């Protein structure tokens, strides 16, 4: 994925799990001892590194204010606990020289308490998790529409596409490259957001 994005000059938004405790990931994939070195390289390239939850563990069956799934690390969790998780997650990223400006939750689910926790415990004011036709500003946050699954031509000014490279097949990479070949000039980084 990194090589493909570099080839077309794409500076992606990458979700970083501060302290991955998701057994579906930790029991399936070997821990990468060079992970934090990779994040430093991505940051050096101008990639945007986002806070992607805290532990990536689902503790509720709620969808919150973006109910695209009925499981969450955040939605339905008390404010004090969410503040603790946001603070801890940001501290872990900062310890690796990452100052997150963007948040997106595991399974894209969060609630009003998540927004309060982000305001009180971080400088994050951009959320890349919403169903909308355009970027909008509400309650002190910019919300960027997010489309799961695959890239496709959409009538929106700005949208993020959600990919999990560890789950992609060869044909998924081929489809992405075909799309990027013809449309890479339409991609923008988070820094370009106006």
What are these regions (language model features)?
Residues 137-175:
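A conserved mid-domain beta-alpha-beta active-site/ligand-binding segment of alpha/beta enzyme cores
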Residues 39-77:
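A basic- and aromatic-enriched beta-loop-alpha substructure that forms the phosphate/nucleotide-
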Residues 12-14, 49-52, 100-103, 126-128, ...:
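Hydrophobic faces of well-ordered beta-strands that scaffold small-molecule active sites
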Residues 9-16, 126, 167-194:
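C-terminal domain-boundary segment and adjacent tail
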Residues 17-19, 54-56, 131-133, 147-149, ...:
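Active-site beta-loop-alpha junctions enriched in small/polar residues
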Residues 19-35, 57, 61, 79, ...:
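Acidic-and-aromatic substrate-binding clefts and catalytic sites of carbohydrate-active enzymes
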Residues 1-45, 181:
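Active-site beta->alpha N-cap acidic-glycine motif
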Residues 73-145:
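Catalytic domains of cell-wall/extracellular-matrix polysaccharide-remodeling enzymes
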């Amino acid at each position: 994925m990194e090589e493909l994005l570099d080839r077309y000059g794409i500076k992606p938004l990458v979700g970083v799990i501060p302290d991955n405790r998701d057994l579906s990931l930790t029991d399936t994939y070997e821990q990468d001892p060079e992970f934090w070195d990779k994040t430093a390289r991505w940051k050096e390239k101008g990639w945007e590194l986002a806070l992607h939850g805290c532990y990536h563990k689902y503790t509720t069956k709620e969808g919150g204010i973006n109910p695209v799934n009925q499981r969450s690390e955040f939605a339905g969790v008390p404010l004090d606990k969410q503040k603790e998780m946001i603070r801890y997650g940001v501290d872990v990223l900062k310890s690796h020289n990452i100052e997150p400006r963007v948040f997106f939750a595991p399974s894209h689910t969060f609630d009003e308490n998540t927004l309060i926790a982000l305001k009180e415990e971080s400088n994050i004011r951009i959320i890349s998790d919403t169903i909308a036709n355009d970027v909008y500003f509400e309650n002190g946050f910019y919300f960027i529409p997010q489309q799961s699954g695959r890239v496709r031509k959409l009538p929106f000014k700005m949208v993020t596409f959600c990919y999990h490279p560890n789950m992609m097949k060869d044909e998924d990479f081929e489809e992405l490259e075909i799309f990027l070949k013809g449309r890479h000039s339409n991609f923008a980084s988070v820094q370009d957001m106006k």
